[in-house]
Amino acid sequence: MIYKNNTITFKEFCMKKHSTHILVIDLEATCDEGDGLPGEEMEVIEIGAVWATADGDVLEEFQALVRPTLHPISDFCQELTGIRQADVDTAPLFPEVAAQLASFAQHYPDATMWGSWGKFDDKQIQRDCQRHGVASPLPALSHVNLKRQFAKSRKIKEVGMARALQMVGLPLDGAHHRGLDDARNIAKLLPWCPPTMI
């Protein structure tokens, strides 16, 4: 794929960075309708991640539920994500899952980037790390807001992942608002993220 005003593909850009791999992460977090739950009190309840090639091919997958400590999962959140309180009652706490993610993030030592659809995931990881007093599980990787890059490449306002897939003619596979399924779908959009924007 060739982009206007650019002669290299996303894959070629990654190779210039001496890596053909990118870690794609999608989080689900506690939430409630309207202003029912302040942003600073939201907690990760699921982490989905995939290692993907610059072409969007998934190589490895990671998925874990996380037990929240501040608030139980609301009816609204359960309806949105399909994750029930019973699903997370026996799940590990964030520090344990963060350590698992840190290990998964080291599978491709040449990688330099991790991406998510928007900046929420990056901010929420930082928020939960601070809350639990643990280091970032992704210290060696720079965050890329793929939602912003997709929008800039098309000169449009930022759109949701489902809309982006529709715009490029790809199906939304799996369950929307589940970490691993969303991470897989975001990975499919990597070829439409122009390297000059990253």
List each language-model region with its residue ranges.
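Metal-dependent phosphoesterase core characteristic of DEDDh/y 3'-5' exonuclease domains
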Residues: 3, 11, 16-21, 40-47, ...
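Single-stranded RNA-binding regions, centering on S1/OB-family and related RNA-binding modules
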Residues: 7
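Active-site histidine-acidic residue metal-binding/catalytic motifs
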Residues: 24
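Short acidic, Gly/Ser-rich segments with clustered Asp/Glu that frequently serve as metal-coordination loops
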Residues: 27-37
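Metal-dependent phosphoesterase signature
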Residues: 80-100, 108
